[in-house]
A protein has these predicted regions:
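Bacterial N-terminal signal peptides that target proteins for export
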Residues: 1-15
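Bacterial N-terminal signal peptides
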Residues: 12-24
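Signal peptide processing junction and immediate N-terminal pro/mature segment
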Residues: 24-31
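Non-globular, low-confidence helical/coil segments that flank catalytic cores
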Residues: 47, 127, 138-144, 320, ...
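Cap/insert and terminal regions of metallo-dependent hydrolase folds
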Residues: 201, 210, 218-322
Length: 329
């Protein structure tokens, strides 16, 4: 029996198409690819906790990354490891800007992946990137790392690959109002993460709502002032009681290095009970926790253990963040 080349090509093509459709349908059915999010320009604000983890890798927690949605505008606050996966799962197909709180790598390491994937998807614009002093050095380093990759994609795809996306518009700012446009005001404020400086948080105000992102900080007057009267405070948090047990084990093992590393980490993170007291004192209406130190599995039992005692000092709702969780003020 003779089969024409055209016939073979048609069979192969049909098989390939079937395979692609099968893969896409399987992935979608498993919830790995979300439909593109439809944004309502008349809506208020919400925060998506895209990455709730810390530098140590954890399968179910990306490192620091949040999205702020204000009407039909989308901003990211930090872009940690695997943030690009959570952005895709959230169906965020466009970005209006990226803000950085500081330059620990677990807060920015995902920037290149995010820009590259938007470029491959065809988003053809330069995305504004803003942060405290150091933003330009960080972005320049990322662009240097991606220079070969970008040159290959341009050689291969030409103008089908967006070069604008890989050239973000970078602004270094000092605390104060850094954005005021179409009813949305964004204020950068200092926080306390020494010896890391500068380190900042962000306050978003839109349609009579206020959403605040702490960045990395201990509980201090500057953080308290930045969070004052927030409808929603998205804050990092540490748990002293859990770390006290870890310190006891490290001392029992005569592991002085581990003891000092834990103590140094506790110095510049927001202890849970102190955070609860602060939130109550400054009138925070809802508290959403992220960037857990130490991290833990996203189970109800582990979550209850981590926030034990916080409601003794704070009478508002406490949301224990999981990756992909959306929180409204």
């Amino acid at each position: 029996m003779q089969v024409s080349r055209t016939g073979i090509a048609n069979v192969v093509c049909s098989f390939c198409l079937f395979s692609i459709l099968f893969i896409e349908s399987t992935v979608s059915a498993q919830g790995l690819i979300a439909p593109n999010r439809q944004l309502d320009p008349e809506a208020g604000m919400s925060a998506i906790l895209l990455g709730t983890g810390i530098p140590l890798p954890q399968a179910d927690r990306a490192s620091a990354c949040n999205a702020l949605i204000a009407g039909d505008r989308v901003f990211l606050v930090d872009t940690g490891r695997n943030c690009v996966l959570r952005v895709r799962e959230a169906g965020l197909t466009d970005l209006n800007g990226i803000f950085y709180t500081h330059y620990h790598s677990d807060h920015f390491i995902g920037l290149g992946e995010i820009l590259l994937n938007y470029g491959v998807a065809g988003l053809d614009k330069s995305i504004p990137v803003e942060g405290p002093v150091g933003a330009k050095e960080m972005v320049d380093g990322m662009l240097a790392n991606y220079s070969l990759d970008v040159s290959y994609r341009i050689a291969h795809h030409g103008d089908k690959f967006s070069t604008a996306i890989m050239n973000p518009t970078v602004t270094e700012s000092r605390p104060g109002v850094i954005f005021d446009e179409d009813g949305l005001t964004i204020t950068m404020f200092p926080v306390c993460h020494e010896p890391i400086a500068p380190a900042v948080g962000y306050r978003f105000e839109y349609k009579d709502q206020t959403v605040v992102f702490s960045g990395d900080t201990n509980v201090c007057p500057a953080f308290a002032e930045g969070a004052r009267d927030a409808d929603l405070l998205v804050s990092e948090v540490s748990n002293q009681a859990i770390w006290d047990r870890a310190l006891s084990m490290a001392r029992a093992a005569n592991n002085q290095r581990q003891v000092e590393m834990i103590q140094e980490g506790l110095e510049y993170h927001a202890e849970s009970l102190a955070l609860a007291r602060m939130a109550q004192e400054v009138g925070v209406k809802k508290l959403a926790l992220t960037h857990f130190f130490p991290s833990f599995p996203p189970t109800e039992q582990a979550e209850a253990n981590f926030i034990r005692g916080m409601s003794d000092f704070y009478d508002g709702p406490i949301v224990v963040g999981r990756d992909g969780m959306e929180v409204a003020p």
